[in-house]
Amino acid sequence: MAQHIGFYMDNIICVHWGTKYPVKFVNILYSMCKRNMTRPFNFYCLTDEPNNAFAERVKPIRIPDPQFDGWWNKMHLYDKRLEIEGNILYMDLDVVVINELDEFFTQYRDEDFLCIRDFGQPTTTINSSVLRYNLKHHSFIYDDYMNNKSLYDGMHGDQNVITDMMLRHEKTQILPDDWTYSFKWPERGQPQKYEKYLPKKHPLKKKAKICVFHGHPNPDYAMQYESGEWVKNYWK
């Protein structure tokens, strides 16, 4: 579990389970965050294998209930047993951090649940690749999920559950669209097939904070092509 400290630092967290992503994805995410945070922060990894070869400053937290499958492990992000104090920025492992992340912590209230609009259709749903929350205010998400697990497990995944619970919640704030964008679908609401898109030149959106690589391709694959050549300068 997380260590208690005398004041609330900013926190960044990711989730790593199974073999879908090598451990280097965790370490690269930490490295990108380190370059793009001017404020002190803790970096946590919620994982089924806390003894993995994580970078020195990565603080592993064992997933409390390892019987969860796949993306349902992400519901543990809201589990008060993590004992993380202060605001928490969650990012999927397949993102590329482009610019400073401080505003996730400085521009909103602690009680605000911050999320981004989805990239495909409809854009009115929540994309769970990037979220900011606080266990003091949002651990009810985990409690509600556990109390209605059979109902929620019938949904497609955690993203649908978060949309159902939080889209109309009074403290939910949708982050500015220009903070995040999709590598595959750079304009929200205009999805393309990646195999048609990948060979094209893909200009970097230099004012964005995070580029999301949902589905295929991942950053390490995309940067082999002209359309993702810029990724080499950031995903490291």
Description of each model-found segment:
Residues I5-I28, R39, C45, F54-R62, ...:
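A glycosyltransferase accessory/donor-loop signature
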Residues Y30-R35:
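Surface-exposed amphipathic alpha-helices with a cationic face
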Residues M37-F41, I84:
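Short, solvent-exposed loop/edge-beta patches enriched in aromatic
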Residues I126-N127, K207:
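A generic structural signal for well-ordered coil/turn residues at beta-strand boundaries
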Residues N51-A55, P60-R62, P66-Q67, W72-T125, ...:
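GT-A fold catalytic core of metal-dependent nucleotide-sugar glycosyltransferases
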Residues T124-I126, M223-Q224:
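Short glycine/proline-enriched turns and hinge-like loops at secondary-structure junctions
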Residues T47-E49:
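Glycosyltransferase specificity loop/lid
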